[in-house]
């Protein structure tokens, strides 16, 4: 094999290897990417089917029901509600009326959580959760004012 052909074969092999590595890295990154959604977005079906995502909002008062290690509760953004089921031990700071972020999937209208994170301080809320609650509240106020005035905008 001539040196020129040898260099060309090596360059081609390097390009194929770099392409394969880039494909594997991007695939791993995409499969580990977890998005945050509010209850209003989940109810509006803005969540991709079968994807793991984070659901954030407030635990509705009076909604926590425990059956052994199985816990069910409702997460709300003050406009919409999503029932959540979790099997495991909840964080110590998990309480009704407090902020929560759960990671899992929607199955049959219920969010099946694999992980539940409670707010660590009564004044702290993740920026994504605060923004989602604000948008949901503004959307709910707009809908109620439109219903009151009869304006279909």
From Swiss-Prot:
Keyword set includes Zinc: no
Residue segments, region Disordered: 130-153
SUPFAM superfamilies per the UniProt record, alphabetical: Heme chaperone CcmE
Transmembrane segments: 8-28
Pfam families noted in UniProt: CcmE
Cellular localisation: Cell inner membrane
Example GO molecular function: metal ion binding
InterPro entries listed in its UniProt record: CcmE (IPR004329), CcmE-like_sf (IPR036127), NA-bd_OB-fold (IPR012340)
Gene Ontology terms: cellular component: plasma membrane
Annotated binding of heme, by residue: 120, 124
Cytoplasmic compartment spans: 1-7
HAMAP family assigned: CcmE
Family that this chain belongs to: Belongs to the CcmE/CycJ family.
Functional summary from the UniProt entry: Heme chaperone required for the biogenesis of c-type cytochromes. Transiently binds heme delivered by CcmC and transfers the heme to apo-cytochromes in a process facilitated by CcmF and CcmH.
The protein, known as: Cytochrome c-type biogenesis protein CcmE
Gene from which the chain derives: ccmE
